[in-house]
Each structure stands twice: as C-alpha cells, then as structure tokens.
Amino acid sequence: ELKLNSYDLGVDIELADAVQRLRFEHPEIGAVVLRSARDNVFCAGANIRMLGKATHGHKVNFCKFTNETRCSIEDATEHSGQHYLAAVNGACAGGGYELALAADHIMLIDDRRSSVALPETPLLAVLPGTGGLTRVTDKRKVRRDLADVFCSTEEGVRGRRAVEWRLVDEAVPPSAWADRVAARAAEFAARSDRPRGAQGVALSRLLAVFRAVPLPVA
C-alpha cells in the first residue's frame, strides 16, 4: 500500500514512461508541472515497507532506476528544451524532494506546513539514494554547511528559509499559488525552443513492451 504519495518500482516505471512520451510524442509541450493532487503531501519518497522487504540487489537496482528517471527529466530539458517545474504543495521528503530536484524550477507553497527534507540519514541511517546530496550542492549550489544541516535533521525546511538556503526557487502564499504556478509554467513554456508544429514520434505501449520482453525474476 502506497501512503503519503510514496512510490515503488511500478510507479517509477510509469513516471519514466510518461517523461519519455511527453518528450518525444508531444513536441508542442514546452513546460511540464510536477504536482500532487493531495493538498498536504507532495511526495514522501520511496515506500519504506517495500524497501524493507526487498533484497539488497533489488534496492540497488531500484535506486539506479529511479535516479535514471530523474536524469531523464534533466536530459529532456537540456537536450529537448522541455522544462520541468516542481509545484510543492505539502510535505516533500526523501525521494520526493529528489524528484523535485530534477526540475528546472522548484516552487514551495508558503503555508507554514509545506517543507522540503532529506531525512534519510537521521531516520534510517542511510544516505539519500537517488542523487539528493549531489543535486543539492552541485546543481542548486547550496552552501556545504547548510547542506550538512539540511541532510542531518529530520525536520524539513519551510517558506522563506528554504528560498534563502537555495533549496527551492520561490515560496508562494496560498492565495497566489494557483495563479503563480500557471504563470511560471507559461513563462518557461515561452522560453522553450521546441518546434510547436513538428510531428511527434509515437512510442510503443508500455504493457506491450513488458509482454514482449519477460523480466528476469531476482
């Protein structure tokens, strides 16, 4: 059971498929918004119960696959001009924040509850598994001392402090949230150099691929 918008391998396979379809089938789309349909949680990251039952090899390959999905988001921006925005409305922790880190621009609703966090080390005694530390320091240019504090505490960072620490790009009051997200998406779409009138490439159906190529059982 996936609670708090957590994800397992199946969810990430579908996400990876969606990223490729948006990139190659829809040249008219210049910006994509990652958001949650739930008000109080953006994404809690990988499902802990699933990981607790998994073998070491499964965990390693799961982390590799999820990181490749995040890399594919960044690659779609760098090489295909399709920009991604993360609209964080609620708790955004662990792999959920690592997903947001793959986006060009991170927006955080400033409602005194929503926050971003990488709590794996204090809670589970492990390092973030899908590029969180690297993207915090190398991509977002968070100061090393602040990154150390951020990754060693359970509590997430909210509002203006998250902006000051460079963990997100902007904190938006709830009253302006919907309009600001729409405006920012339009702004990034206008920057895109994707050919609006081009013909997309139809990709094979995901289920058809799985049926044609049986997966080995670990």
Regions picked out by a protein language model, each given a short descriptive name:
Residues 14-15, 34, 47, 69, ...:
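Terminal peptide-recognition signature
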Residues 84, 106-107, 171:
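Short, well-ordered beta-strand core segments
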Residues 21, 71-79:
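Conserved helix-loop functional segments at active or binding sites
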